[in-house]
A protein has these predicted regions:
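Non-ligating segments of multi-cofactor redox enzymes
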Residues: 1-103, 109-112, 116-149
Length: 149
């Protein structure tokens, strides 16, 4: 019985030593959303469709990003630019551009595959929802963060 009491005290001292050692360290918990989150330079967040310096969409509807995506979460429909209304600088543009974030693995292959740098990773990460259909981001939402001239 005396041996059991000694083992119990030794175990308590060992456990409390870990607690007391870490009590004086700086906490690693982020106070989000009260304090802004600091992102690493190469953070892969929610995608952003870019515009060029004239305010036209950079996406030319080439489908390379959709072909490179291992999760098959990118859906594109291309249309031809007309002479009176130009959407992008190329001959075609993406009339429909959807990303299904319930499937996206944020691998970055779509960004690497894009020849016009039309799609990039932003720093957005807030997409929690109870509606699965809200996880499909359409072209308009992906263009929101891109500056318009």
């Amino acid at each position: 019985m005396l041996q059991e009491a000694g083992e119990t005290i030794a175990t308590l001292v060992k456990g409390f030593s870990v607690t007391f050692r870490n009590m004086l360290r700086k906490p690693v918990t982020e106070n989000y959303p009260e304090e802004p989150v600091q992102f690493q330079p190469r953070y892969r967040g929610i995608h952003v469709l870019q515009r060029d310096e004239n305010g036209l969409e950079k996406c030319v509807g080439c489908f390379l990003c959709a072909a490179a995506c291992p999760a098959r979460c990118i859906y594109i429909e291309a249309a031809e630019n007309s002479a009176d209304q130009r959407i992008s600088a190329g001959e075609r543009y993406a009339s429909v551009y959807n990303i299904d974030y319930s499937r996206c693995i944020f691998c970055g292959y779509c960004v690497e595959a894009c020849p016009t740098d039309a799609i990039t990773h932003g720093h957005g990460f807030e997409m929690a929802t109870s509606n699965i259909n809200a996880m499909i981001y359409r072209k308009e939402k992906l263009l929101e963060k891109a500056p318009r001239k």
